Amino acid sequence: MPPKAPCKECIMKKIIIIGASSGLGERIATDFARAGWRVGIAARRMDKLETIRNLYPANIAAAEIDVTAQDAVKKFYDLIELIDGMDILLYAAGIGFYDPDMEDERVTTTLDTNVTGFARITAAAYKYYKSTANRTPGHIAAITSIAGTKGIGVAAAYSASKKFQQTFINALEQLAYQQQVNVRFTDIRPGFIRTPLLDPEKEYPMIMSVDHAAPLIETAILKRKRVAVIDSRWAIVNGLWRLVPQRVWRHISLKW
């Protein structure tokens, strides 16, 4: 069962970040903690989470959560209780591969994290907000990708998984309206960002640093934007390629 809503006297804002052990999740977690938020961080690498927690021990709580495991929801709810509530969930966990050979292990690993794990945690967050809807306005934010707006052959599992995330958010939003659950949604769609997800030896078009992308993502979350493409250059590219019909798109060779 979802945990109870926090007490009315607990005025410190609270955010839980899934996938906070490195990259964007780590940076956003430390930024929110520095700003005075109570931050719950979760990932599989507890040693890395402890290092981050020690930067702001009064503001950060850490939990080892593998989103692909059956106990992920229980541990997620335990983390909500540990920080006494959740104003925002940010799902920043993700994995993907350049995989033109469609290797089975890479495909299944991608789908386990980006589809099953994502649905498991965001659905649990929705249930939490539904159980506390009259007292605690909710916000579910997720870092998806512009890759979710088109099928990308050399990263088929990744792009399809990101499309799933975007559609799942849309479906939850509709459900929230139908059930009158007070929760907002933010779909964050970045282009290439230099994080451990990418091959450090490769060059990528219009690649962004974490220092550049993180503040843009944080602004989108705090302003509760419904969809935010990161950054403006990628917004233009994304707008253009969405206009390309599939009969043309299938002939385009994307390589990186």
Segments (PLM) and residue ranges:
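Residue(s) in the substrate-gating loop at a strand-loop-helix junction
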Residues: S145
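Short alpha-helical oligomerization interface
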Residues: D99-D112
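Conserved glycine-rich cofactor-binding loop
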Residues: S21-S22
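Active-site helix of classical SDR
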Residues: T122, S161
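Conserved NAD(P)H cofactor-binding loop of Rossmann-fold oxidoreductase domains
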Residues: A92-Y98
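C-terminal helical subdomain
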Residues: D187, K202-N238
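Rossmann-fold cofactor-recognition segment
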Residues: Y56-D71
